[in-house]
């Protein structure tokens, strides 16, 4: 695979990566195969589509506290997601329920494996399977959890949750490659007890939860809305085209490869 990627990269005038971490990996693995520095064009999100419910439209609860609701979204036939939910339900959720016995978990995503479906047998866990629209489920949640232990791919799910103004608790691997600050945009915890403690804090402290929600939404709107991402892509294309114009064969169109 390394040989194939090296040969492929040599064919292109420019390379795009979706994160700084990916750019650093490419530069480390293939310093002799890339013609110029890798340009980062981050994964984008439609912040108009993934938007929070305005506070003046949120339901009012009288004489009762809302039931703590946690959510995870993703394709549930993908090993990292399956592993994350099995790990969360077996090792983290018991800690949470020792403090918040009524806490519920909703697992939203297509093709749940038999092992994931079986999690619902324990009670207080809903496995939806494929849904047409994840937003109603996300809007009802108090905290969005990302207990990933296996890396790979991009973390678009976190940007979608942040765009919707959700407080996110993630492992380091879950937030890998994302320019978020622990304690400002998300809460990061890597062992079961610490992860559970972060979730419980956000369940109980509405002000702290709101601080995270507001900061997360602001970051995504500023830097990861599709309009901002399109600007980065335009810069990359202009740079690659300008470099190509100074070479021997200016008639040939610049070629790009995107590493995800």
Residue ranges of each PLM-predicted region?
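Carbohydrate-associated surface elements
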Residues: 21, 41-44
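Conserved donor-binding/catalytic core segment of Leloir-type glycosyltransferases
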Residues: 62-89, 93
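A short, well-ordered alpha-helix in the C-terminal region of glycosyltransferases
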Residues: 208-222, 229-232
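Short hydrophobic beta-strand element within catalytic cores of glycosyltransferases
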Residues: 157-160, 167-171
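Acidic donor-binding loop of glycosyltransferase active sites
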Residues: 13, 124, 139-153, 164-167
């Amino acid at each position: 695979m390394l040989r194939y990627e090296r040969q492929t990269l040599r064919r292109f005038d420019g390379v795009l990566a979706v994160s700084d971490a990916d750019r650093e990996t490419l530069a480390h693995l293939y310093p002799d195969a890339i013609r110029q520095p890798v340009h980062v064009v981050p994964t984008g999100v439609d912040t108009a589509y993934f938007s929070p419910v305005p506070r003046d439209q949120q339901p009012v609860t009288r004489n009762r506290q809302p039931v703590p609701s946690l959510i995870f979204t993703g394709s549930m036939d993908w090993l990292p997601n399956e592993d994350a939910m099995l790990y969360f339900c077996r090792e983290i959720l018991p800690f949470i329920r020792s403090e918040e016995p009524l806490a519920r978990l909703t697992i939203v995503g297509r093709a749940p494996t038999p092992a994931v479906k079986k999690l619902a047998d324990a009670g207080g866990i809903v496995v939806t399977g494929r849904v047409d629209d994840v937003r109603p489920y996300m809007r009802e949640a108090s905290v969005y959890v990302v207990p990933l232990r296996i890396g790979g791919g991009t973390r678009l799910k976190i940007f979608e949750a942040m765009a919707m103004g959700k407080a996110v608790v993630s492992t380091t691997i879950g937030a890998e490659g994302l320019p978020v600050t622990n304690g400002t945009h998300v809460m990061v915890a890597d062992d079961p007890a610490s992860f559970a403690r972060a979730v419980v804090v956000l369940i109980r402290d509405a002000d702290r939860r709101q601080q995270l929600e507001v900061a997360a939404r602001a970051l995504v709107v500023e830097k990861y809305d599709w309009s901002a991402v399109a600007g980065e892509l335009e810069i990359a294309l202009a740079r690659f085209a300008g470099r190509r114009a100074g070479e021997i064969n200016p008639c040939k169109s610049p070629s790009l490869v995107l590493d995800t």
